[in-house]
């Protein structure tokens, strides 16, 4: 009978078994990559809001600016504007789609100044809002399908009008900041102007 080197040399067999029984060693992978601090803060805030079961945390300046303010880019008339921007900016309420949302093409500082304008009735006349003195371009998003993420579908409406907002006092910075965008009211098609009380007046 022919003998193999393993059967003729037991020591060789033991060495081979020793190699096979050693714990598997994985090569260490360098996963130390830098992430911008603002992106990490946004991600942590998103996870906290996503898991939160109690009342929604009051909005901060950074949150309002990130979710509402937009810059020139995709045409505001684009049919999928809301679907893409709401997903990109993580505009959700916990695990549900928001029923409506506004994107405004303006600087945050300009939006903040509206908090000190005259009061006018909000949409549906429920509360008092502050209204912008000038016209602002933006997009109104209205939920049409689904209620839970990620299946939210919106219809987009381009608007150019007066912004109605509610404001809240933020203790950390000791000033009023925009709280919610209540409406973006388009002016009448016919010629009109605003009087000192912020009311539309039609010339005779």
Curated annotation (Swiss-Prot):
Signal peptide residue numbers: 1-26
Keywords carried by this UniProt record: Disulfide bond, Glycoprotein, Secreted, Signal
Function: Does not exhibit any ribonuclease activity.
Membrane-spanning parts: none
Covalent S-S links between cysteines: 97-152, 115-167, 122-129
Organism, scientific name: Macaca nemestrina (Pig-tailed macaque)
GO biological process, one term: defense response to Gram-positive bacterium
Protein name per its UniProtKB record: Inactive ribonuclease-like protein 9
């Amino acid at each position: 009978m022919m003998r193999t080197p393993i059967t003729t040399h037991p020591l060789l067999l033991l060495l081979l078994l020793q190699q096979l029984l050693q714990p598997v060693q994985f090569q260490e992978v360098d996963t130390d990559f830098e992430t911008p601090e603002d992106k990490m803060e946004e991600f942590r805030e998103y996870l906290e809001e996503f898991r939160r079961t109690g009342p929604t945390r009051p909005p901060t300046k950074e949150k309002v600016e990130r979710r509402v303010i937009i810059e020139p880019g995709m045409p505001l008339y684009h049919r999928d504007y809301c679907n893409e921007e709401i997903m990109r900016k993580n505009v959700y309420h916990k695990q549900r789609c928001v029923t409506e949302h506004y994107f405004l093409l303006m600087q945050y500082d300009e939006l903040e100044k509206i908090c000190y304008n005259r009061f006018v009735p909000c949409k549906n006349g429920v509360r008092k809002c502050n209204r912008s003195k000038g016209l602002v371009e933006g997009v109104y998003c209205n939920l049409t399908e689904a209620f839970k993420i990620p299946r939210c579908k919106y219809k987009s409406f381009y608007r150019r009008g007066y912004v109605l907002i509610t404001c809240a006092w933020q203790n950390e910075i000791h000033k009023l900041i925009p709280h919610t965008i209540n409406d973006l009211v388009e002016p009448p098609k016919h010629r009109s102007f605003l009087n000192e009380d912020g009311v539309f007046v039609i010339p005779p």
